[in-house]
Amino acid sequence: MTTTTTTTMSTLPMVLVDEILSRVPITSLRSLRSTCKRWEAQSKTNLVGGKATARKSSYLGFILIGNKICSMKLDLNGGDDFVDTSVNQISAFDDFEISQLFHCDGLLLCVSNKHYYSNTVMVCNMYLGETRLIEHCCLLEGFDNFGSYAFGYDSSKNRNHKIFRKKLVSGGYEIYSFKSDSWKDLNVDLGESTELCELGSVSLKGNAYFSVITKHEEEELWENNLLCFDFTTESFGKFLSLPFDNVTAEEEFGIMVLSCVRDEHLAVLYQLDTLGIWISTEIEPNKVSWREFLQVDLYTLDGFPDAFTAGRFIVDEEKQVVVVFNEATEIDLNHGNAFIFGRDGYFTSFNVGDTPPQDFTSYVPSLASLQIEKTGG
């Protein structure tokens, strides 16, 4: 006699459930969770415990291609098939054209690509399926598509998330509080000679770190600097030390890009004659120390394209490689628009979409809600 056992989602071993959930695109998890309460509970446990992104060779993120938001899963496998990518445009946002992406605590800040100003920005929790449109009370002070922004939260128990931005019309800076659902001006000043770089901020442990440029006009020198904005004190710290020579003549000025390593460390890339990457060993709003991760002489790489401008990047400490997106305006797709550099001299390229990626952010899902808290009374 043969006995047939029907296995349903609710009776699958949790080891297998974990494996399945780790492979499901973040934008599909919401509909999947609704089919089984056990899976919903386990997916949330995975998020809180970090299992959903625990695969050290797998990276989850969002990328802008043609001003459209796409989810991207990147697997660094090693060997001949070193990289495996999966890029999918998110149909729910087909009507939105986006120019910048910022990630903080599982939330995604999306800046509109409307020229010249938009009166709203959008914040999403892709895992919870929540979206919040944030308006500005003054149309003339709308959101510039390539303005300076930062995303973070304060040290309060419930993590009040905040958005920082530079005002281009009236000057100065302002901040939005999710808790109060309001904007306010900030009493901070960087001086006339220091500028926040476009696409220049990343969020780490609630604070934002900016790539900034200080111009010394009389000496005809430019200076790269690193600056922290503390969302608890709502103020800038002092310039933080950088691990490379950060003062050069204007015509020799290099490219500096910031990234986060597993939301634990800050990484800085600097491209001039060589491409160097350093990772923080200790970081606070007013103090940082570094260790070198990678140095590459681009001119010695056989077949490396002339048109290369380092953009957003991903560091894989386990496999000792870095993935760098090419932001050059004219790219030969035969060379690829993303590059992998290894500490052992390894180099290869691959394509992400048919056009150069405009922005990228790694993503760590969370249960942070975008619902506005209602006060009693």
Swiss-Prot record:
Ranges for domain F-box: 6-52
InterPro entries on file: A_thaliana_F-box (IPR050233), F-box-assoc_dom_typ1 (IPR006527), F-box-assoc_interact_dom (IPR017451), F-box-like_dom_sf (IPR036047), F-box_dom (IPR001810)
Domain of life: Eukaryota
Protein name: Putative F-box protein At3g13830
Species the sequence originates in: Arabidopsis thaliana
